[in-house]
Amino acid sequence: MTFMDFEKLRHGTELIKRGFARMQKGGVIMDVTTPEQARIAEEAGAVAVMALQAVPADIRKAGGVARMADPEIVQQIIETVTIPVMAKARIGHFVEAEILEALGVDMVDESEVLTPADPFYHIDKTQFTVPFVCGARNLGEALRRINEGAAMIRTKGEAGTGDVSQAVKHMKQIQGEIRALAGKTKEELIMVAREIEAPIELVVETAKMQRLPVVNFAAGGVATPADAALMMRLGADGVFVGSGIFKAENPEKMAKAVVEAVNNYDNPVKLAEISKGVGAGMKGISADMIPAQEALQERGW
């Protein structure tokens, strides 16, 4: 009987990386900063947790340079829960990503929520065995990240605001650009590839599939069960929730309600019941009130 290396099965080839990402479909991934929060997320039904130093709302409020979480905290979170643990690295900071991979995280988020480390390049994700998720506002950004090796895409939205409008905008933008590819000739697709600065092979594949070649989650401003259901109705494969859980009045109730909302996103009667008694959501800030130079979604290229 051949011995199976389960670490190699979990990580490694592009097929395996994308397979792991697809396993999270239909689920909720929650930002956590402590093992206690990770336990709450798991008990609420999250399919995975995202370990970071502070939730986006606090990162935005504190200012300064936002970096990878303390490896000791990441390790404690890994040891606390049985669901997959993801963690954020700065854009272009391949050493942070290497450290997270060495810690044994299940996925790395090359995230615009943290302060970008490289003004020229994103991480070459093909050089890693751990899968990556990256943010995107449009089809060009999404396909460039996939070309670099991303196994999952998420909308950027505007993290830490509690305002879902930018996540809606980015989801509709990507889907609209994909629909516009339908029926185009090879020559026309080549022109599109040039315009959006993406590889023609990925443009052709996307046109044929009429969706991104990898799973596409919603993120950035999801703060209520209704927000989560809205993003699923718009075609998201799943939902990331950052500040919306642990900045809510009752994090435990909000976490469970968001998971239930994603599971019942197309049933308004159930959504009404789910939304009762969860307490107030995070206070938040309108994304329109944020100056362009302070918008996290503008990070990355």
Swiss-Prot record:
Job of this protein: Catalyzes the formation of pyridoxal 5'-phosphate from ribose 5-phosphate (RBP), glyceraldehyde 3-phosphate (G3P) and ammonia. The ammonia is provided by the PdxT subunit. Can also use ribulose 5-phosphate and dihydroxyacetone phosphate as substrates, resulting from enzyme-catalyzed isomerization of RBP and G3P, respectively.
Subunit-level organization: In the presence of PdxT, forms a dodecamer of heterodimers.
Active-site residues (renumbered): K88 (schiff-base intermediate with d-ribose 5-phosphate)
Protein name: Pyridoxal 5'-phosphate synthase subunit PdxS
Family note: Belongs to the PdxS/SNZ family.
PANTHER family tied to this protein: PYRIDOXAL 5'-PHOSPHATE SYNTHASE SUBUNIT SNZ1-RELATED (PTHR31829:SF0)
Catalytic activity: aldehydo-D-ribose 5-phosphate + D-glyceraldehyde 3-phosphate + L-glutamine = pyridoxal 5'-phosphate + L-glutamate + phosphate + 3 H2O + H(+)
Pathway(s) where this gene product acts: Cofactor biosynthesis; pyridoxal 5'-phosphate biosynthesis
HAMAP family, A to Z: PdxS (MF_01824)
GO molecular function, one term: pyridoxal 5'-phosphate synthase (glutamine hydrolysing) activity
Gene name linked to the record: pdxS
Enzyme class: lyase
Organism: Methanosarcina acetivorans (strain ATCC 35395 / DSM 2834 / JCM 12185 / C2A)
Domain of life: Archaea
Xref: Pfam families: SOR_SNZ (PF01680)
